[in-house]
Every structure is written in structure tokens, then in C-alpha cells.
């Protein structure tokens, strides 16, 4: 059965390892977690953020001095969920190396830039996109006004962090995130979102 067929059936590949004590089976993600590799694939939401945060904390407890590799292929999603990942990345002792494979958009791009300086990478054909946070509110006018003010505060917070992570001016970040701003891997490197475009392992 091909990998695509396996994925369509909702199955996760299993890796069998042999040792002097016999055989042991791992799902592929658990096996990669042993190598300190974690993934964010798909939308950023409470569930995916909870899994990433738990893995970050687990790997810190395993070895607080060894880097963690964080692979990202995400269209973005919830700001609050994404910020829980961002804050945990800054909180833990190990440095987190980020790598974009495919797409890092919105909160995905924010987390890509949140990796340790000098250790933020992208594969050559990936796309990166930044924009301002989206929001929608219903209800009474006063409630809508409260939500609008909160979105503006969130935008200022995200822009300030992006300016710090990229080295761009706050004014440029504000202008560029006014609408969807797409970049190639090379453009993202020039912008300061990543440090290097890599096509092969060193």
C-alpha cells in the first residue's frame, strides 16, 4: 500500500526496531520524537497546540541541553493557540530549530520566525505568508467594539514580536501585514523570517 493510500485511510506508518531484547513497534511520529523531531502539520488550533506544547515540555525533561527540531507545514489558525506554542518555545531551556516544509502562513510563519536565531530554515520550494490577525464578532455593538479593540491589541503585539524576530522596523511590519504578504523561501530569508534556505542536509 502506498504512503498516500495509507494516509487517506487515516493510518500512521509503523516502524519496527530490533534489539537484543526483541522487536519493538513505534508509530512513525513517536519514533521521530525520540530523535527530538516534532511536527505542526495543518491548522493551528487548541488540539494541535496542546500536542506541540506537550512534546516540547517532554523533550526538555529528557534533555534540557539538546536542540529540538520543529517542522512546520501549516496555514495558520488560532492566535491564542499559536501563542501558547510560541511562549513555550521561549520558556524551555533547549533551543528550538524551525524548518518550513510546504507552507508556513499566518501563525505558521510567526512560529517559524520564533525559532532560535541562526537555526530557522526553509526548504527551497516552501511558501511563507504573513498578515494581520483575522477576527469576527457578533452580538451587541458594545461587544463588537470590545472585540475590535482586542484584535487591534493583538495585532500590535504580534507585529512587535515579528519586528524583533526579523530585524525589520515596526512600521514595515505594520505595512506588510496589512494584507496577505507571500514570500518565497529566499525572500523570507532576506526579510529575516528565516536564516537559511536548505535543499540538502549538511
From Swiss-Prot:
Keywords: Cytoplasm, Hydrolase, Protease, Serine protease. It is found in: Cytoplasm. It catalyses: Hydrolysis of proteins to small peptides in the presence of ATP and magnesium. alpha-casein is the usual test substrate. In the absence of ATP, only oligopeptides shorter than five residues are hydrolyzed (such as succinyl-Leu-Tyr-|-NHMec, and Leu-Tyr-Leu-|-Tyr-Trp, in which cleavage of the -Tyr-|-Leu- and -Tyr-|-Trp bonds also occurs). GO terms for biological process: protein quality control for misfolded or incompletely synthesized proteins. It comes from the Bacteria. The keyword Cytoplasm applies. Pfam families: CLP_protease (PF00574). Its EC number is 3.4.21.92. Its main location: cytoplasm. One of its GO terms (cellular component) is endopeptidase Clp complex. InterPro entries: ClpP (IPR001907), ClpP/crotonase-like_dom_sf (IPR029045), ClpP/TepA (IPR023562), ClpP_His_AS (IPR033135), ClpP_Ser_AS (IPR018215). GO terms for molecular function: ATP-dependent peptidase activity; ATPase binding; serine-type endopeptidase activity. The active site is at 106 (nucleophile), 131. Coiled coil: none annotated. Gene3D superfamilies: 2-enoyl-CoA Hydratase, Chain A, domain 1 (3.90.226.10). PROSITE patterns: CLP_PROTEASE_HIS, CLP_PROTEASE_SER. CDD domains: S14_ClpP_2. Belongs to the peptidase S14 family. Fourteen ClpP subunits assemble into 2 heptameric rings which stack back to back to give a disk-like structure with a central cavity, resembling the structure of eukaryotic proteasomes. Cleaves peptides in various proteins in a process that requires ATP hydrolysis. Has a chymotrypsin-like activity. Plays a major role in the degradation of misfolded proteins. This is ATP-dependent Clp protease proteolytic subunit. It comes from Leptothrix cholodnii (strain ATCC 51168 / LMG 8142 / SP-6) (Leptothrix discophora (strain SP-6)). The lineage of its organism: Bacteria, Pseudomonadati, Pseudomonadota, Betaproteobacteria, Burkholderiales. The gene is clpP.
Amino acid at each position: 500500500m502506498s504512503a498516500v493510500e495509507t494516509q487517506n485511510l487515516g493510518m500512521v506508518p509503523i516502524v519496527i526496531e530490533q534489539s537484543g531484547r526483541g522487536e519493538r513497534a513505534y508509530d512513525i511520529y513517536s519514533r521521530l520524537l525520540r530523535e527530538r523531531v516534532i511536527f505542526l502539520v495543518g491548522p493551528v488550533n487548541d488540539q494541535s497546540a496542546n500536542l506541540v506544547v506537550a512534546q516540547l515540555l517532554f523533550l526538555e525533561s529528557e534533555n534540557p541541553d539538546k536542540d529540538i527540531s520543529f517542522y512546520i507545514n501549516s496555514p495558520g489558525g488560532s492566535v491564542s493557540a499559536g501563542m501558547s506554542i510560541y511562549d513555550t518555545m521561549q520558556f524551555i531551556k533547549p533551543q528550538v530549530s524551525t524548518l518550513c516544509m510546504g507552507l508556513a502562513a499566518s501563525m505558521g510563519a510567526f512560529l517559524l520566525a520564533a525559532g532560535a536565531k541562526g537555526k530557522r530554515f526553509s526548504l527551497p520550494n516552501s511558501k511563507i505568508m504573513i498578515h494581520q490577525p483575522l477576527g469576527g464578532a457578533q452580538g451587541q455593538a458594545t461587544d463588537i467594539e470590545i472585540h475590535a479593540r482586542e484584535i487591534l491589541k493583538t495585532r500590535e503585539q504580534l507585529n512587535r514580536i515579528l519586528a524583533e524576530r526579523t530585524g525589520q522596523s515596526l512600521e514595515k511590519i505594520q505595512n506588510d501585514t496589512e494584507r496577505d504578504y507571500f514570500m518565497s523561501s529566499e525572500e523570507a530569508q532576506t526579510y529575516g523570517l528565516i536564516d537559511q534556505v536548505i535543499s540538502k542536509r549538511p
